[in-house]
Amino acid sequence: MHMSLEVLEQLESKVQSAVDNISLLKMELDELKEQNSKLQDENHLLRNEHVAWQERLRALLGKMEQMGESI
């Protein structure tokens, strides 16, 4: 009887350790999801900014070509 109680206590300890570990991993996962969401938002903004810069550069090059043609 004593042996089975000891085994039960060990099992209980291992289960509690696993539960604690799972809780920590869930918190870490939530943090990573939040960080990923922020990075996706930042990436979206940077892509839009890049497109805007490309459009402005094309417009400037177009004006320079027009000036070159009119000379």
Curated annotation (Swiss-Prot):
One of its GO terms (biological process) is division septum assembly. The keyword Cell cycle applies. The keyword Manganese does not apply. It is found in: Cytoplasm. Its main location: cytoplasm. It holds the Pfam family ZapB. Keywords: Cell cycle, Cell division, Coiled coil, Cytoplasm, Septation. Residues 5-67 form a coiled coil. GO terms for cellular component: cytoplasm. Non-essential, abundant cell division factor that is required for proper Z-ring formation. It is recruited early to the divisome by direct interaction with FtsZ, stimulating Z-ring assembly and thereby promoting cell division earlier in the cell cycle. Its recruitment to the Z-ring requires functional FtsA or ZipA. Belongs to the ZapB family. Homodimer. The ends of the coiled-coil dimer bind to each other, forming polymers. Interacts with FtsZ. This is Cell division protein ZapB. It comes from Aeromonas salmonicida (strain A449). The gene is zapB.
